[in-house]
Amino acid sequence: MGKLMAEKEIDRKVAIILATDVVNYSKHMEANESETVKNLRACELILQKFIKKHDGRLFNSGGDSFFIEFPSAVEAVECAVAFQKDINKRNNSDKITVPLEFRIGISMGDVIKEKENLLGDGVNVAARLEALA
């Protein structure tokens, strides 16, 4: 009976998740830590602009990785494409000494809402797809 009650208390839903992180982040940090962090923060501002534009919600981040929930798959894909275009343009600028490239994975699946965070297979699949990108 206790297990059944615990299951009912879990807040589940279907969500569209975008996972992204920096390619070769550890190597960038090893080579030039301060410049890498500076560039990562600038790229994060670009990402936040597109998250807002496409009605997304950043629910988890750590180091160079970001997890975002979207109301639709179309919004997630449009956000990813716009972000990659802006990052590519930024990386081709003469001012950038440490260009950062981002991998992105998008999935739709069941998640568990825990406070403001999302957990579960839907998040894990997005992270696995991102790692394959």
Regions found by a protein language model. Name each.
Residues 2-79, 86:
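Catalytic NTP-binding/metal-coordinating core of nucleotidyl cyclase/transferase enzymes
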